[in-house]
Every structure is written in structure tokens, then in C-alpha cells.
A protein has these predicted regions:
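Catalytic core of Fe(II)/2-oxoglutarate
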Residues: 123-176
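Non-heme Fe(II)-dependent double-stranded beta-helix
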Residues: 1-65, 69-71
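Aromatic-acidic/polar surface patches that form glycan- and anion
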Residues: 13-24, 80, 132, 136-140
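A short, structural micro-pattern
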Residues: 43, 81-83, 162-164
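Short, well-ordered beta-to-alpha junction loops that form the rim of enzyme active sites
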Residues: 47-49, 104, 150-152
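Short, solvent-exposed loop/turn segments at secondary-structure junctions
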Residues: 54-56, 68, 92-95, 106-107, ...
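Catalytic core of non-heme Fe(II) oxygenases with the double-stranded beta-helix
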Residues: 58-138
Length: 176
């Protein structure tokens, strides 16, 4: 399995996406200026791809808030000046796109543990503490996207299909 650092799109791809995808033009209208974050310290914004194989493989981690990664030392950003958002776009998938989330969770103060994996501290959350009825699956077709702040509890979803799920995503910051 490739680590996140090995899945970051090259800088020229990022510039191409930012110039060609309408969603980034729309985001600039809403937020004025967006800055794609560089969590992997590569010297440019990190837009990365993800491939998740179908069951029986479990190429997903536990549910998490992206904020927890930042709190544990991934990336550097002045939280007093900037707010973080995540953009997740389905490239290939079926009705259930492999993205699950808990509506309203940005307002919940949830406990988590952490582990050292791939030379980074990563949050570990016990999903059983939520109850299945609180977890929702994003549904749609390829091109479906979700934009959320970094305090939404979310994660990848193991799918019982015959084809893998492919997505691209990035975190961006805007001035408060």
C-alpha cells in the first residue's frame, strides 16, 4: 500500500486541476483566496489520489476528524488566522462511494487515541461508540464531491462491490 506522500499528484497536475476544474473557480468566488495545504512538506499544495479495493480488503483507517491529524503534528498552519476545509471527489465508484460521515459531528467533542504508523502519529477512533444509525454513506456517481470543515467525523468505507473505489482529495485553508 502506498503512503499518502507517495500518492500526492505532481505539482504540474495540481496547477492543471486548479485551472481546469470549475469547482475551484466556484470556491474562489465563495472564499476569495484558497491555499492548498502542504501536509507532506513537499514545497507545494498536496492533492492526492486514493484507491480502495473492495471487500475483503480493508484499505481504510478508522473514522477521524482531519483536525486530529493537525493536532498530532501533521502539517503546520496558524489556526488563529486560517480555517481548514477538505474537498473529496469521487473519480470511480458505485452508488455508495466509499465515504462515510456523521452529520453534526463538527460540534461533538470526541475522544480518540493515537498510534505511530508510517512514521507519523495517527488518530484512532472507536466507531462502535457512535452506533451505526449515526453514520451516513455518501451516495452518488463519479464526480460527486463533498466539501467539509476539518472537524467533521468521517472515514473511508469498505465496500462490498466488485470494483475498487478511486477518489482525489485535498485540504485547503482560507483566512478567517
Amino acid at each position: 500500500i502506498l503512503t499518502k506522500k507517495n500518492r500526492v499528484l505532481p505539482k504540474e497536475y495540481l496547477e492543471n486541476l486548479l485551472n481546469k476544474l470549475e469547482i475551484f473557480k466556484d470556491l474562489e468566488k465563495i472564499f476569495s483566496k484558497i491555499i492548498i495545504t502542504d501536509e507532506e512538506n513537499l514545497g507545494f499544495g498536496n492533492f492526492y489520489w486514493r484507491l480502495v479495493r473492495p471487500f475483503p480488503y480493508t484499505d481504510v483507517g478508522t473514522m477521524h476528524k482531519d483536525k486530529w491529524f493537525w493536532d498530532l503534528g501533521t502539517g503546520k498552519m496558524n489556526n488563529k488566522i486560517f480555517k481548514r476545509y477538505k474537498l473529496w471527489i469521487s473519480i470511480k465508484g458505485e452508488d455508495k462511494l466509499g465515504f462515510k460521515f456523521v452529520p453534526g459531528s463538527a460540534n461533538l467533542n470526541l475522544d480518540y487515541k493515537f498510534e505511530l504508523k508510517d512514521a507519523k502519529l495517527k488518530p484512532v477512533f472507536d466507531e462502535k461508540s457512535l452506533g451505526k444509525n449515526k453514520i451516513h454513506s455518501l451516495k452518488g456517481e463519479k464526480g460527486t464531491f463533498i466539501l467539509f470543515n476539518d472537524e467533521l467525523l468521517h472515514g473511508g468505507e469498505v465496500l462490498h462491490t466488485h470494483t475498487p473505489r478511486v477518489s482525489i482529495e485535498c485540504t485547503f485553508q482560507v483566512k478567517k
